[in-house]
Amino acid sequence: MKNYIVLLLLAIMAVSCGPYQTALKSTDNEVKLAMIDTLLKREKYSKAVNLFDQIIPQYRGTDKAEALSIKYAKALYETRDYPNSAYQYERFVQSHPASDNREYAAFMGAKSHYHMSAVYSKSQVNTDRALAKLQDYINLYPDGEYAEQANGLVSELRFKLDRKAYEIAKNYHHRNRYIPAIKSFENFIVQHPGSEFMDDAQFYLIDSQYLYALKSRNELVPERLELATKYYNTFVSRFPTSEYREDADEIMENINDYKIKNNI
């Protein structure tokens, strides 16, 4: 038993005094640089970051700054430290405008912001920022190496914003808050013209306006039903084969029945 404990302690000491720990404690930056390259090859990014944090300030303004900066940013990105990777990539772009890695850094900085975008149900401040950063890259490098990927990320983020806006409007509708629902769906249709939720929004706008009309004072019903009819005509013109077509037709039949019964 005692021999086992001794061996265990020796193993722990061996690990604690291994090459990485030696480099971490060393005052020789060349030792740290060599270990960083080894760790990056082995994809041990967290350990590499620890060493980078020790030496990066000492190499700013030197011939090695450019190569170290891009490696540091990549290591941060691979550890999913996206706020810091975004910062380091953007700093690289500003500090090394003539670098061959400038386009790569510009894209990866924007992609770091993309990863900070929250799910659609939460605040989309980071999504807006990521879209702006990706658009900056696309504008700067329209035929760039990463342009296709950047456009794909933009589409994903726009879909997220579309969904958030649509779900907010739909929530008003389902809670029978027809005035804000109508306003929200109208804004959605204008502000999200290419959205996959467009026929959904157009249908719920009809339904919201129709139900709002029915809850109105008698003298206001005709005018509000006319607006629902206008929304219906737009809907069937744009989406004649929509999954909501039958429901929309039923609303229109109800509107016509109401007009007949009330001599409108």
Residue ranges and their predicted role:
Residues 16-264:
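Acidic, polar-rich low-complexity tracts and alpha-helical solenoid repeat scaffolds
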